[in-house]
A protein has these predicted regions:
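Acidic-and-aromatic substrate-binding clefts and catalytic sites of carbohydrate-active enzymes
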Residues: 22-25, 45-53, 75-81, 106-111, ...
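A structural motif
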Residues: 39, 95-98, 126, 150, ...
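A short, structured active-site edge motif that brings together acidic residues
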Residues: 65-78, 99-106, 133, 354
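N-terminal binding-site loop/beta-alpha segment at the start of enzyme catalytic domains
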Residues: 1-68, 183
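Beta/alpha (TIM)-barrel catalytic core signal, keyed to glycine-rich beta->alpha loops juxtaposed to Asp/Glu
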Residues: 105-281
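CE4/NodB-like, metal-dependent polysaccharide N-deacetylase domain
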Residues: 83-103, 119-123
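Short, acidic/polar
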Residues: 22-34, 78-93, 139
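A beta-strand edge to alpha-helix "cap/lid" segment located at domain peripheries
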Residues: 283-289, 293-315, 320-421
Length: 421
């Protein structure tokens, strides 16, 4: 990995993972896959609503925190309470510090927010400061008012829109450009340019890798987004070749003044400012969805057990058939003892209380107080139980049962009654 030394001597990986438009679950898996692939820079934002997901991916990766460069952004509707939102961001991500904190949009009281960021910087909560989507005039305004100058400006940047005038201005202050949309947005027009096909063939790379290499040689930081382990590996495989000066000049011919994919005006900024600054709302929704996902895995397990028992239970209609308890076959003479010992063949579950807990992002435990109803020898028995199920998250994000323990409780409440025939 190549590193960029910022104007405050902090070292930042030249390439990182962008998580724009990713759900908390997708951001978690993308972060995990990226760190396993060798990435050491992860970018998120308050306004992406996935910071907690990124944090889970970081924890699950096992990569030491000091080896990871985490950047995030404050949303403008929170600028007036920037100090509070800085602390909330740290708490949301479970971090002691943020490597790069960025003002996301050039609207609202960004000068007051910058002052709050400077105080957090001095307190060691932030290692570097940046601006996002700010035009040159507003960057100059921040620089003029700032005690701590920006280290980075993240803007739309790609061969169609290299932003060379802004680059020249920022170079006076040693400010690095970080490119979002480094591949020219979601369409394929940029990567289908013939020059990239030609250079890809020459270097044994893909057009995407050639474009990302162009950014590196321009001095840009880049944060392409991907959830695919294969694409992540490809995006990182750009540091073993270099484009010549003539090739860089040929790519420069693609630049078209005004060819951008993103524009914003005051009406857009007004919408940004109207967005509520409750950035935990999607995480709360994700936790609800995660709980439902784990319970669905549990229901599949219980259903499989019930299907097995009910199928086997049908055999008890034949007096010569063996007695079956939870998939275990016993001789017919054991039936009365099974009833006496309050063993059951479950046919119905009635949950009284269910608690789902996720531990260390990869282990889920379901604590369940329930009643199990059995039909034994034509009779119905109802037993109260406490069950503990433990699930492990697999590489594909699914949950696998790894242990199941149930304990019979309150035997004085045991019910056994004859059914009418």
């Amino acid at each position: 990995m190549q590193y960029i030394t910022l104007n405050n001597d902090v070292k930042m990986p030249a390439e990182g993972l962008g998580t724009f438009l990713m759900s908390p679950a997708d951001a978690e898996m993308a972060t995990l896959n990226a760190l396993r692939a060798g990435f050491r820079h992860i970018d998120t934002a308050n306004g992406y609503y996935n910071e907690a997901g990124v944090a889970r991916g970081i924890r699950r990766s096992g990569v030491p925190r000091e080896q990871i460069f985490v950047s995030t952004k404050l949303w403008p509707s929170g600028y007036t309470r920037a100090a509070e939102h800085i602390d909330k961001t740290l708490a949301r991500m479970g971090l002691d510090y943020i490597d790069m904190l960025i003002l996301h949009q050039p609207c609202g009281d960004y000068l007051a927010a910058w002052k709050a960021m400077e105080e957090a910087y001095k307190a060691g909560k932030i290692r570097a400061l940046g601006l996002s989507n700010f035009p040159e005039a507003k960057i100059a305004e921040v620089i003029e008012a700032a005690e701590v100058k920006p280290q980075l400006v993240t803007v739309e940047n790609h061969p169609y829109h290299p932003n060379d005038a802004l680059r020249e201005y920022l170079s006076k202050y040693g400010i690095v450009i970080e490119a979002w949309y480094p591949l020219g947005h979601g369409d394929a027009s940029l990567r289908n340019e013939p020059v990239f096909a030609k250079l890809a063939e020459k270097y044994g790379k893909s057009p995407v890798q050639v474009i990302l290499r162009w950014h590196i040689q321009k001095g840009n930081s880049i944060i392409p987004g991907s959830k695919s382990p294969a694409h992540l590996a490809d995006n990182l495989d750009i540091f073993d070749f270099a484009l010549t000066d003539d090739e860089m000049a040929e790519i420069a011919k693609l630049a078209e003044p005004g060819k951008t994919y993103y524009t914003a005006d005051e009406s857009v900024y007004e919408k940004y400012l109207s967005i509520p600054d409750d950035f935990d709302v999607q995480e709360a929704k994700y936790q609800e969805e995660l709980r439902a996902e784990i319970l669905a895995a549990s229901d599949e397990y219980w259903k499989a057990q019930f299907d097995l028992d009910v199928d086997q239970l049908r055999k008890t209609t034949d007096p010569k058939a063996p007695f079956v308890h939870m998939g275990i076959t016993m001789d017919r003479g054991a039936e009365e003892e099974a009833i006496a010992q309050r063993h059951i063949v479950t046919v119905k579950r009635d949950d009284k209380h269910v608690d789902v807990r996720v531990i260390d992002d990869e282990i889920a435990i379901i604590l369940r107080q329930l009643e199990l109803t059995a039909l034994v020898g034509g009779n119905e028995a109802i037993n109260p139980f406490v069950a503990t199920e433990t699930y492990h998250r697999q590489a594909d994000g699914s949950w696998k049962l790894i242990s199941f323990v149930y304990t019979h409780i309150m035997p004085e409440h045991y019910q056994f009654r004859f059914l009418s025939k």
